[in-house]
Amino acid sequence: MSYYSHLSGGLGCGLAVAVTMGRTVAVAEYGRCRHGCHSSYSAR
């Protein structure tokens, strides 16, 4: 029982970390893409 609860707890923690990292990467990618689009748009 304790092993199962520990396993689910670890899974939830891993999921939270994955979501946080994914969100950070998404924000960084979005900011870089928007910056690139703006620079290329102004260049034209």
From Swiss-Prot:
The keyword Repeat applies. GO terms for cellular component: intermediate filament. Keywords: Keratin, Repeat. The keyword Repeat applies. Interacts with hair keratins. Belongs to the KRTAP type 20 family. In the hair cortex, hair keratin intermediate filaments are embedded in an interfilamentous matrix, consisting of hair keratin-associated proteins (KRTAP), which are essential for the formation of a rigid and resistant hair shaft through their extensive disulfide bond cross-linking with abundant cysteine residues of hair keratins. The matrix proteins include the high-sulfur and high-glycine-tyrosine keratins. This is Putative keratin-associated protein 20-4. It comes from Homo sapiens. The lineage of its organism: Eukaryota, Metazoa, Chordata, Craniata, Vertebrata. The gene is KRTAP20-4.
